[in-house]
């Protein structure tokens, strides 16, 4: 079955969405979803050894493999199905149809599970629908997937707000989340709101030591730093980009890694990746040398005969 939609079709509908023309954009997007789902049912069925995705980049694909440890063959589809569902969710949100928006964003996450903005927006929809546990769970899931400081900060800010809810109150954990969010994205509005709420409601919380509040987060199972695995993936992709001569992309990815885990940790990861690449290249060179030696020996034996 031929793919019935194209990137141009999605972009065409997005133009109406950007203009606020929901009356035109919504039926266009719904038709694209209908056509795409017919294609998905016929051509993209999940199998035991194969799954289909619409990752945005090579980095996301690598990060998914390392974080999820999914052994299946990962097949990249030709059209960004995730964008189509995200657009659909946005249209539903504008119409205050939060249940339909939630369902659409869940599909966006399914097609690009490494897009943390989808996860965070979906978390807010669950919160609007009064499912605070799922709001917190999705925010938590961002921490091991976030590839930039802003997304990680927003996830920490959400968890901080969760720890201020009456039924789950843990002020020390909330303070810990606020401090981590502040380090990652000091100007983020979610971070600012959390800090303001803590300051207004619990003014003495500022006196708690970092050791105490980070220890409380550890007890709650919340990591106190973004994922080193994600930073490694960023540096690996930066190294590949540099090898391909794309210095701009290499710099962009390296800066993301630095902003995520800090300059010292980033430098250590760069050193580790370079050493690993050097070892791998040495092994390949040795294998080629051994293979060449065997070929020469075989040729000499043939000449002797």
Kindly label every feature range from the protein language model.
Residues 84, 118, 152-155, 191, ...:
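TPR alpha-solenoid repeat register
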Residues 22, 98, 132, 169-171, ...:
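TPR-repeat structural position
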Residues 37, 79, 113, 147-150, ...:
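Short coil turns that delineate tetratricopeptide repeat
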């Amino acid at each position: 079955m031929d793919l019935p939609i194209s990137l141009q079709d999605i972009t065409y509908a997005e133009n109406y969405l950007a203009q606020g023309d929901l009356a035109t954009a919504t039926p266009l997007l719904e038709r694209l979803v209908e056509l795409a789902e017919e294609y998905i049912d016929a051509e993209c069925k999940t199998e035991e050894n194969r799954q289909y995705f619409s990752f945005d980049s090579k980095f996301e694909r690598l990060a998914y493999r390392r974080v999820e440890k999914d052994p299946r063959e990962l097949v990249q589809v030709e059209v960004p199905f995730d964008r189509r569902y995200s657009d659909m969710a946005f249209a539903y949100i504008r119409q205050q149809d939060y249940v339909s928006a939630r369902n659409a964003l869940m599909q966006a996450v399914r097609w690009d599970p490494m897009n943390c903005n989808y996860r965070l927006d979906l978390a807010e929809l669950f919160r609007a629908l009064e499912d605070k546990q799922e709001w917190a769970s999705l925010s938590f899931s961002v921490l091991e997937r976030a590839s930039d400081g802003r997304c990680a900060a927003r996830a920490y800010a959400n968890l901080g707000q969760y720890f201020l809810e009456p039924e789950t109150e843990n002020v020390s954990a909330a303070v810990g989340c606020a401090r981590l969010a502040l380090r990652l994205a000091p100007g983020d509005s979610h971070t600012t709101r959390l800090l303001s709420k803590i300051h207004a409601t619990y003014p003495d919380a500022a006196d708690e030591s970092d050791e105490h509040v980070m220890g409380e987060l550890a007890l709650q199972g919340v990591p106190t730093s973004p994922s080193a695995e994600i930073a490694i993936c960023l540096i690996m992709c930066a190294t590949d980009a540099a090898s391909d001569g794309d210095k701009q992309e290499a710099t962009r990815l390296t800066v993301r890694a630095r902003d995520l885990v800090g300059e010292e940790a980033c430098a250590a990861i760069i050193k580790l990746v370079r050493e690993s690449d050097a070892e791998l290249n040495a092994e390949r060179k040795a294998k080629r040398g051994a293979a060449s030696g065997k070929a020469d020996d075989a040729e000499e034996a043939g000449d002797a005969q």
